[in-house]
């Protein structure tokens, strides 16, 4: 009888400990969530609960590799394997890359004497509403086509005002040509032919909206044949950023998506390859 009572008491103790552990775990989880929320708020990061309305994620980043086409027509991404798994039991590559290679961000410093570096871009300007302006029809007819103020005004008429801190993206369909010479589309004289932003479109966004960034699915914010980088010089010195060689813009709605720009953070950088995606 005594043994049975002892065993029963032991079982009670074990069950009591289990219940306490469960309660403690719940408390710790709640504390962790609360602490994480406070930390996130302090860092300016949007808590997951605020993003619960998004149902899908679209990758807007092309895979970067040695043969990725570049504005200058020369290789800009290099890698050398320093450690191999077969020999060292881990793999490691050393990279050398031009900042403006692949899907990448242009910081204001890229086209100004003292603009913000890529490391200084404010977080609230990197998670923004995305407005996709579709110019595929005229880009198919003319590779030198430009996104104009009229294109933006037509978007506004159909979708409403450009939201504060938005990224206005040009969808020209040019990413379909990636992997062929038509992506650069250089003529016999070496001049490239692909769509981009008209300088007046950049000025319109500066003067009439509070957009934070512009994006293109080509190699440059300016169209390929531009002799003077007019859109770059109008846009970037105003403290705004640009995104070049974006992927999958055709998979997004004209409005309603949220762009997340995973910009690099190297000191004094004029830009850099970025991991970019959209929440829809």
Over which residues does each language-model region extend?
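Active-/binding-site microenvironments in catalytic and ligand-binding cores
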Residues: 2-280
